[in-house]
Amino acid sequence: MRIGVVGDPDVVVGFRLAGLTDVYEVKSPEQAAKAIEELNSNSEIGLIITTERIGEQVRDTISAVKKVVVEVPDKNGPIVRENDPVKVLVRNAVGVDIK
């Protein structure tokens, strides 16, 4: 299993330095969607990493992906959300609200 990365120049440089080769540097949501679709169609890729901001811009594309997609903060830090998606998943799964 290989890992694919889709991100802005500041994010992808770190993953390239870590030795990942399936790295796509994108500058627009259209480029990001195309890169994610390419990674999704590659049978050797098992995990796709992208930034939260790109994730929000191409949510429909990510929803159609059959692989694990992880969204990480970019250089500007994490996106502040009203509802933490992890808390929502836990509450739905076990019926307990995490504070």
Curated annotation (Swiss-Prot):
* Species name: Methanococcus maripaludis (strain C5 / ATCC BAA-1333)
Q: What family name appears in the similarity comment?
A: Belongs to the V-ATPase F subunit family.
Q: Which InterPro entries does the annotation name?
A: ATPase_V1-cplx_f_g_su, ATPase_V1-cplx_fsu_bac/arc, ATPase_V1_fsu_sf
Tell me the membrane topology, using the record's own terms: Peripheral membrane protein
Q: Name one GO molecular function term.
A: proton-transporting ATPase activity, rotational mechanism
Task: Give the protein name, as stated in the record.
Answer: A-type ATP synthase subunit F
**What function does the entry list?**
Component of the A-type ATP synthase that produces ATP from ADP in the presence of a proton gradient across the membrane.
The listed locations are: Cell membrane
Q: Which GO terms describe its biological process?
A: proton motive force-driven plasma membrane ATP synthesis
Whichever gene encodes this chain, its name is atpF
Q: List the disulfide bonds.
A: none
Subunit details: Has multiple subunits with at least A(3), B(3), C, D, E, F, H, I and proteolipid K(x).
What SUPFAM superfamilies has UniProt attached to this entry? AtpF-like (SSF159468)
Q: Which UniProt keywords apply?
A: ATP synthesis, Cell membrane, Hydrogen ion transport, Ion transport, Membrane, Transport
Under the cellular component aspect of Gene Ontology, which terms does the record hold? plasma membrane
Its domain of life? Archaea
